[in-house]
């Protein structure tokens, strides 16, 4: 059972809907959360834009399964984006692991949604899903007995770090939007307001991280299960690629993508792959100076598909590399003046460990500079935790 959404979560939803309206020209949007996690469908609106919009015009198709935990064999019913029976309407599930917590419904009257726009909506849905988990855990804490302190701190630190990446991507999209809006454009004040609220959210996340609030798991002491399923790599990585391209333009860097055609599917939890690659890309951008290059490359070999995130930054000293995946370790970067928590690589490695996978680091990568992180995923067998 889900707790009712807090006022803070509802306010975050409204801010994200305003961003979508202003940047993508949506005519109406809504965020629904499930009121129960059982076999009876029950959806409750949390935020609607514009506020006077009729919920009937943003109806959830009856074909959408009930809000519940989705077994691996049924995951095909919950694609990242669902085109409804209504014209120009998208429905994106707010998913955390295999749990459908709610849906984001977006409607636009005069033109269909482009692939890049759908990728931006997926970023918004991902942000709202993680924010919903944080909100639920906060409420769970106030109604539940204490859990072991170290366990709660570690799980909450991980979630805060995972939330920073999609919020940072939204911040980048807003900055790009402001660069393209004329000073007298009627939508500029709204975009500036969204930019300020996004910066405020990032500051709050950093403040919460430093305070290390004690927040337990959504379902108590038992973690939600991982489940492997066949993934289309190009489609799965599209939201991350779109965000990286926007960030490269904003920061004066080059982003290179190398994805060969006709890749075989791999069996891996979609959320796991996106979190791992998202953390690697975030690190690559942070430690690559202006004018540098960041790359994402997929290479098919036997018996594994190799995914590599590389950069032309300053590199990682050999003596620091054995400790890269320790929680909180930043090495020489701790004195660089670049913000960081030292959690990204540790989280990535922890997410991969149940599948028997791990990251491999190469530094220097190009000449005497740069760093590359490679993930080898067997594609001739199903990978299960």
Curated annotation (Swiss-Prot):
Q: Which cofactor does it need?
A: [3Fe-4S] cluster
Task: Indicate the quaternary assembly.
Answer: Hexamers; upon treatment with 0.5 M NaCl only tetramers are seen. The tetramers are probably inactive.
Which portions of the sequence form the region DHp domain, may sense NaCl? 142-270
Q: Where Phosphohistidine occurs along the chain?
A: 161
Q: Which family does it belong to?
A: Belongs to the chloroplast sensor kinase protein family.
Query: What GO annotations for molecular function exist for this entry?
Result: 3 iron, 4 sulfur cluster binding; metal ion binding; phosphorelay sensor kinase activity
What Pfam families has UniProt attached to this entry? GAF, HATPase_c, HisKA
Q: Tell me what reaction this enzyme catalyses.
A: ATP + protein L-histidine = ADP + protein N-phospho-L-histidine
Domain GAF as annotated: residue spans:
11-131
Q: Which residues form the Histidine kinase domain?
A: 158-381
The function of this protein is: Member of 2 two-component regulatory system(s) Hik2/Rre1 and Hik2/RppA. Transduces PQ (plastoquinone) redox signals to photosystem gene expression machinery during the adjustment of photosystem stoichiometry. Reduced PQ suppresses its autophosphorylation activity (i.e. kinase activity is higher under oxidizing conditions). As part of a two-component regulatory system with Rre1, controls expression of sigB and several other genes in response to hyperosmotic stress. May transfer phosphate to RppA in a possible Hik2/RppA two-component system.
Species assigned in the record: Thermosynechococcus vestitus (strain NIES-2133 / IAM M-273 / BP-1)
Tell me which SUPFAM superfamilies the record gives. Answer: ATPase domain of HSP90 chaperone/DNA topoisomerase II/histidine kinase, GAF domain-like, Homodimeric domain of signal transducing histidine kinase
Which of the seven top EC classes does this enzyme belong to? transferase
The record's annotation in Gene3D superfamilies points to: 1.10.287.130, 3.30.450.40, Histidine kinase-like ATPase, C-terminal domain
Q: What is known of its domains?
A: Oligomerization seems to be mediated by the histidine kinase domain (residues 142-386) which forms tetramers and hexamers. The DHp subdomain (dimerization and phosphotransfer, residues 142-270) forms hexamers and octamers. NaCl treatment reduces the histidine kinase domain to tetramers and the DHp domain to hexamers, suggests the DHp domain senses NaCl.
Name under which the protein is recorded: Sensor histidine kinase Hik2
What phylogenetic lineage does the species belong to? Bacteria, Bacillati, Cyanobacteriota, Cyanophyceae, Acaryochloridales
The EC number on file is 2.7.13.3
Record's keyword annotation contains Metal-binding: yes
């Amino acid at each position: 059972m889900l707790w009712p959404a807090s006022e803070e979560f509802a306010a975050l939803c409204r801010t994200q809907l305003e961003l979508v309206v202003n940047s993508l020209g949506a005519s109406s949007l809504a965020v629904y959360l499930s009121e129960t996690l059982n076999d009876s469908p029950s959806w409750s609106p949390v935020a609607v834009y514009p506020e006077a919009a009729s919920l009937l015009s943003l109806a959830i198709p009856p074909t959408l399964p009930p809000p519940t935990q989705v077994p691996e064999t049924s995951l095909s019913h919950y694609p990242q984006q669902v085109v409804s029976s209504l014209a120009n309407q998208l429905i994106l599930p707010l998913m955390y692991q295999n749990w459908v917590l709610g849906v984001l419904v977006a409607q636009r009257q005069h033109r269909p949604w482009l692939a890049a726009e759908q990728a931006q909506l997926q970023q918004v849905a991902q942000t709202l899903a993680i924010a919903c988990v944080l909100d639920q855990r906060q409420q769970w804490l106030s109604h539940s007995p204490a859990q072991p302190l170290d366990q709660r701190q570690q799980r909450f630190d991980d979630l805060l770090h995972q939330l920073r990446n999609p919020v940072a991507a939204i911040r980048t999209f807003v900055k790009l939007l402001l660069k393209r809006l004329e000073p007298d454009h009627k939508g500029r004040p709204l975009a500036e307001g969204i930019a300020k609220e996004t910066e405020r959210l990032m500051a709050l996340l950093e403040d919460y991280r430093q305070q290390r609030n004690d927040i337990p798991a959504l379902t108590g002491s038992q973690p939600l299960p991982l489940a492997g399923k066949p993934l289309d790599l190009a489609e799965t990585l599209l939201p991350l690629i779109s965000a990286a391209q926007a960030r490269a333009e904003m920061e004066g860097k080059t982003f290179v993508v190398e994805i060969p055609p006709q890749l075989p599917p791999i069996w891996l939890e979609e959320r796991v792959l996106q979190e791992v690659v998202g953390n690697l890309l975030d690190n690559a951008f942070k430690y690559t100076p202006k004018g540098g290059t960041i790359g994402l490359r997929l290479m098919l070999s036997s018996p594994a598909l190799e995914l590599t995130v590389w950069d032309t930054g300053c590199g990682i000293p050999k003596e620091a590399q054995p400790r890269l995946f320790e929680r909180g370790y930043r090495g020489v970067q701790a004195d660089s003046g670049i913000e960081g928590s030292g959690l990204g690589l540790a989280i990535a490695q922890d997410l991969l460990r149940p599948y028997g996978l791990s990251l491999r680091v190469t530094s220097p990568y190009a000449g005497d500079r740069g760093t590359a992180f490679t993930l080898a995923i067997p594609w001739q067998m199903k990978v299960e935790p």
